[in-house]
């Protein structure tokens, strides 16, 4: 059975880009007779906005979204992440990293998603002294391409050794890394289809590699076009994207429907009816591949 999900982070309030992702993932799930889960990715407390999680859920309800089951909170799932890391440790696929960023980034090269880790701590003889600090944990990556066929973008691949380097699963400050948490959650929740923004396309080969290491199924992925401002920057909390206006729900839904190339919806003042209409007319094949500039 199709199981999709929407996984916002409570570092801020939902904005127009969030609404596009929620609407597309919802329409794809419901049009396939599937479940649609909501998961709160609250992994980084220092960056979270007080009250954002409850505001996000209230906003989704106000826009007519209905999710299946209880909302999952990553902050309550640490035991799952510990078990997942333990499996990788037992298999000898991970190692403790004692490097500070200063230790390795000075001589590092830029890759697909920031600096490429140089593998210094792969060799126990080269690991710097801990000096009472907890290490991070990294996973060894292969020197080969890991690719997949995306439902919107098409074929995409990375050589993890060249483009990413051994990546962190547990940070030295004790916080779980996004890549491990999302793979563990998707597997445990039985997620089969992931519809999300293209800013996460670069993360997908890492997640597929982790799925392979853990022996869990790889979902089908579809990465949506990003909404950008006049300067070409992705609308986000960092670029001061305005929060969704609950007094303009129908107008905003129609706006994201146009971005997703849905036909013009009939007149109604009920957001839930607009979502039902989007489900009935959903066509992933018409979704644009490239970024969309918005007012």
Swiss-Prot record:
Disulfide bonds: none annotated. ATP binds at residue 237. It comes from the Bacteria. Pfam families: tRNA-synt_1c (PF00749). InterPro entries: Glu-Q_tRNA(Asp)_Synthase (IPR022380), Glu/Gln-tRNA-synth (IPR000924), Glu/Gln-tRNA-synth_Ib_cat-dom (IPR020058), GluQ/Sye (IPR049940), Rossmann-like_a/b/a_fold (IPR014729). A motif ('KMSKS' region) lies at residues 234-238. Its cofactor is Zn(2+). Its EC number is 6.1.1.-. Binds 1 zinc ion per subunit. Transmembrane segments: none annotated. GO terms for cellular component: cytosol. Zn(2+) binds at residues 97, 99, 117, 121. One of its GO terms (biological process) is tRNA modification. A motif ('HIGH' region) lies at residues 8-18. The keyword Nucleotide-binding applies. The keyword Transport does not apply. GO terms for molecular function: ATP binding; glutamate-tRNA ligase activity; zinc ion binding. It is an enzyme of class 6 (ligase). Catalyzes the tRNA-independent activation of glutamate in presence of ATP and the subsequent transfer of glutamate onto a tRNA(Asp). Glutamate is transferred on the 2-amino-5-(4,5-dihydroxy-2-cyclopenten-1-yl) moiety of the queuosine in the wobble position of the QUC anticodon. NCBIfam families: PRK05710.1-3 (NF004314), queuosine_YadB (TIGR03838). Belongs to the class-I aminoacyl-tRNA synthetase family. GluQ subfamily. This is Glutamyl-Q tRNA(Asp) synthetase. The gene is gluQ.
